[in-house]
Amino acid sequence: MEMGKAAAVVLAVNGKRYEAAGVDPSTTLLEFLRTHTPVRGPKLGCGEGGCGACVVLVSKYDPATDEVTEFSASSCLTLLHSVDRCSVTTSEGIGNTKDGYHPVQQRLSGFHASQCGFCTPGMCMSIFSALVKADKAANRPAPPAGFSKLTSSEAEKAVSGNLCRCTGYRPIVDACKSFAADVDLEDLGLNCFWKKGDEPADVSKLPGYNSGDVCTFPDFLKSEMKSSIQQANSAPVPVSDDGWYRPRSIDELHRLFQSSSFDENSVKIVASNTGSGVYKDQDLYDKYIDIKGIPELSVINRNDKGIELGSVVSISKAIEVLSDGNLVFRKIAGHLNKVASPFVRNTATIGGNIVMAQRLPFASDIATILLAAGSTVTIQVASKRLCFTLEEFLQQPPCDSRTLLLSIFIPEWGSNDVTFETFRAAPRPLGNAVSYVNSAFLARTSLDAASKDHLIEDICLAFGAYGADHAIRARKVEDYLKGKTVSSSVILEAVRLLKGSIKPSEGSTHPEYRISLAVSFLFTFLSSLANSLNESAKVSGTNEHSPEKQLKLDINDLPIRSRQEIFFTDAYKPVGKAIKKAGVEIQASGEAVYVDDIPAPKDCLYGAFIYSTHPHAHVKSINFKPSLASQKIITVITAKDIPSGGQNVGYSFPMIGEEALFADPVAEFAGQNIGVVIAQTQKYAYMAAKQAIIEYSTENLQPPILTIEDAIERSSFFQTLPFVAPKPVGDYDKGMSEADHKILSAEVKIESQYFFYMEPQVALAIPDEDNCITIYFSTQLPESTQNVVAKCVGIPFHNVRVITRRVGGGFGGKALKSMHVACACAVAALKLQRPVRMYLDRKTDMIMAGGRHPMKVKYSVGFKSNGKITALHLDLGINGGISPDMSPMIAAPVIGSLKKYNWGNLAFDTKVCKTNVSSKSSMRAPGDAQGSFIAEAIIEHVASALSADTNTIRRKNLHDFESLAVFFGDSAGEASTYSLVTMFDKLASSPEYQHRAEMVEQFNRSNKWKKRGISCVPVTYEVQLRPTPGKVSIMNDGSIAVEVGGVELGQGLWTKVKQMTAFGLGQLCPGGGESLLDKVRVIQADTLSMIQGGVTGGSTTSETSCEAVRKSCVALVESLKPIKENLEAKTGTVEWSALIAQASMASVNLSAHAYWTPDPTFTSYLNYGAGTSEVEIDVLTGATTILRSDLVYDCGQSLNPAVDLGQVEGAFVQGVGFFTNEEYATNSDGLVIHDGTWTYKIPTVDTIPKQFNVELINSARDQKRVLSSKASGEPPLLLASSVHCAMREAIRAARKEFSVCTGPANSAITFQMDVPATMPVVKELCGLDVVERYLESVSAASPTNTAKA
């Protein structure tokens, strides 16, 4: 074969030409952008195509047609060589500080749709790509001025694949919908463009949008491509020095295969590389063959027999082609729209998906639906071209890389007498989630002349993703159904046969649930084949008068609606104004600098953790598999490399304890750091760490303690700190003696939750002169990190400088748990005397993170017949993991939030268990989230025992102020500030709530297989005030620099501090404080500049930082006031700049520092809120849709309503994830196995409430608080338990309908629902066998036993 020198990869990035020669073929586009260009907008959030942080727009030009095609793509999966001669546009390319911001960026900013900002550039590009696609659609009418051709529904779906952990998505959705021509602008939420309620919403007030403003494919690249066409056509096969091969025909591909330099282990065949997001490469390949350039693989042929799709046709293109077809094709297209996410579908290929399904245990939706549609495949093996049915292809032994899938043919079925349906059950309705089970059914029917019933002539039943190697056809069921008319007895027998055919393999999760899903799907399909509508209603459970019939809508397609009610105050302006977040535009453009965006210093090295996979074992040795990656290792840092005088410490906190940095000599939990691989690039470090071979020994070691039960049995506990230990209330025994009824030893379990900050743990350590070191670090604890790093490497604190500018999300996970990264970088940097950077891959981050505390609770409660509770006792078991972290303090908030109700008398026994798992940490609302849920579980249980309305029991047991003071002491504050009862009554006692509750009852009476529930919960949250420093410095030009102890995590701290600074100095300005806002800059946290910075956490850092700044401003005003008065006497009005110039000349100190400490009589206060949620569950699948949530939250006098609203919504949605969907699963050794976006599902835009209403109330002023404000960061998370409680109500309705009496209570209405209530949990509580039992009852009730289904 003729070999030619490789041509360099040429591409345009934001209009600028880049050329890359000799680049490693495994280099991704994201890696190239971040290391070879100034671009920093695309971020590495997951490396799996599952988060959207890396989304870019790729534009391809066809010189033959002179057309440019554009699509969004996940740059973390896209290989650099695959975008040769393409143009790439990032968030910086559509708008930036220099050239001005794009309307997408401006609207995201103005709708308050960015908090930490790490996800925002990817959001921008997903929206921008959707706009480009819609505006190029020729078949759509021109939109009104200022709008695009997008519809509201399309605008929401544009970001369906993008994750955001901060905002709760509602403001992002509003920004998206602002571009839609069919939107009612009055429905959009709080923004900076018009004042809601006071000014009319008008598109002219929005940043103007015109399609085509951004050039996505530069002319210079078009010219180069045109000039190279002839040369390319006559050139030999491009065989490159860098290992990237682009055959232009199948013959060329086979010549490559026949070359002696190719073997199975060294070559990877790629079309889009999206498969690497599913099956992460354990090593690097040295040769890649890109088959996308083979024209035959891109064919799309359509005739009267069907549609042929080439194997490298993208899923998005397939959707486009199939959407313009018959019923079967359109149904396939609709299902494909729920596979992956838009930016993955744009590049992922139909053939690649099917080949993965054939080779690997891949849960493919595409294989299942194409199997049901009777598809065939054409493959080529060597010179042989073969055609198989898809079923035959899937059943063959896994094909090797030399077997080439050429095309897939989907036959034309027509529409007459053909019924085709597809099904999937997944945690997210719009895709970006693997199915628990998928299925597709095709039936051809005819009319039976004698009975006039529909007769099944032929049928295909395909099932996939249920735990088998590949999708299958249920042949026995098909054979049984052929020739039959559908009746309840026929369906019942088909279901029984199916249960014998669907057999999840050993080790599959939720096997009984998966079988039940398959039954549900078959039942639903066969029911639709019933001839009589009335008889069909017996199965579907609907009737013409039901709300379900009246609202014949797919609730997952409803545009998200919202309402915000906010009271604004001008008492302290600009404090109290809803100004947009500081720095939000540069977050949207991608110019905001996070730690990994700092350019790599000269000679920088990169690290990756090697972690234990054993929960308790001696580490005997570390070796590496022979591989390309292991050849790149420079060294491995372990405990022996800690400098003399240093200590093996990864974190430490006063009075609590510490955790080792390295396992030495025993690994005490699966996921513990054993060593750090150091390599020349981050990719090589990642890959080498995966190649580590650890030799373990368990000789002379006890078995690991992994569960709360294990710890209690072996008495393995941490001691609760006495000064934070919760205190009992009253006399429990006396309270129980007064009770009319008792519930004894009931149990509830709560599992863990992962933080899922969008920015993984990251640090950059740079050694400096005189044994000093500077660490750029993403942390909530700069000061503590400084202290721990110094202790670890054995140097004075003043030799360690920790700098934190902004953090891409924290939620408690960037507190103690993050310090290991900084310490590891410091040890390596000082040993090697070179900068060392670590950026954890998402899997390692998730395995080491620990997360929220799992708990097991046993409770006994006594209560009166009227529902008044007289006594409660808890046995509380808390899994703290291997080291203390914050666990010794966790019992206090658990009991504290539980105290929202007046239990009469409260006693408890808490055990914080020490176990061989990663230490658990403080995650947003730590302990409080669990405690508030426990309280609701008990209230629900009492209500069930009394057959009483749950809200009546809640209201009966809410505190009056006197009992509140008994339970909370000084934290209760003044009676005038107790707003909980008012808020609860506002929701639960309103006529609207009563009407909605009646509608829910009506819906449930009318619908058998869908049930609704509604619930209202109160919350109380105690926060602690902590000392905080602040410093305000006025420059000679009048600009102002502010430093505070708190760190900007996305919570709006900088924004509130800016407002407080302007307020504090405003009395010196003619225009008041508002005129100073643009002059204030809050600068990064720096431990050598601002000492005693403390902790950014606990929800109060913003307000305490503001108060420290206000006190600094008071000092400055005192200094400047005499000068101002003197100038006013001479000249009248004094401008700010003149005042500062004069003060500088007079040598006035223009910098003031304050260290605010709380009043000893007021160190804590209570926050209150109430939330109502209405949900709908699918009894057949366990899926839950949140129809509506109404939140009322007491924000005091809000320092910034836009910021506080964002905190309320974001916390609530994070809580929804905790209570419903986030399953942080581990294996039998305690090693996290839900370790990426593929398996761990946080909420997305399609899982938030369809109607999302928030009211911020301003409670009575309290001058003890900072300008009467209140915290908003954590308390609202507790309101998400309203969703869990509403789900319980819906499940109760289903259990009553089907007489399901599972659980210890053996009751339909009394049952325990643990956290999280995932789809399998919901379905199991509704009854895994409800379909069979229902069919049995219908069959038995039918006189002829052949009732039509």
UniProtKB/Swiss-Prot annotation:
One Pfam assignment: CO_deh_flav_C
InterPro entries attached to this UniProt entry: 2Fe-2S-bd, 2Fe-2S-bd_dom_sf, 2Fe-2S_ferredoxin-like_sf, 2Fe-2S_ferredoxin-type, 2Fe2S_fd_BS, Ald_Oxase/Xan_DH_a/b, Ald_Oxase/Xan_DH_a/b_sf, Ald_Oxase/xanthine_DH-like
Binding site for [2Fe-2S] cluster: 46, 51, 54
Entry EC no(s): 1.2.3.7
Co-factor binding comment: Binds 2 [2Fe-2S] clusters.
UniProt-annotated location(s): Cytoplasm
Domain named FAD-binding PCMH-type: residues: 237-415
Keyword Oxidoreductase appears in the UniProt entry: yes
Reaction(s) the record says it catalyses: indole-3-acetaldehyde + O2 + H2O = (indol-3-yl)acetate + H2O2 + H(+)
Location, primary (coarse class): cytoplasm
GO molecular function, a single term: oxidoreductase activity
Classification via PANTHER family: INDOLE-3-ACETALDEHYDE OXIDASE, XANTHINE DEHYDROGENASE
Family according to the record: Belongs to the xanthine dehydrogenase family.
Protein name (record): Indole-3-acetaldehyde oxidase
The organism of origin for this protein: Zea mays (Maize)
Lineage summary: Eukaryota, Viridiplantae, Streptophyta, Embryophyta, Tracheophyta
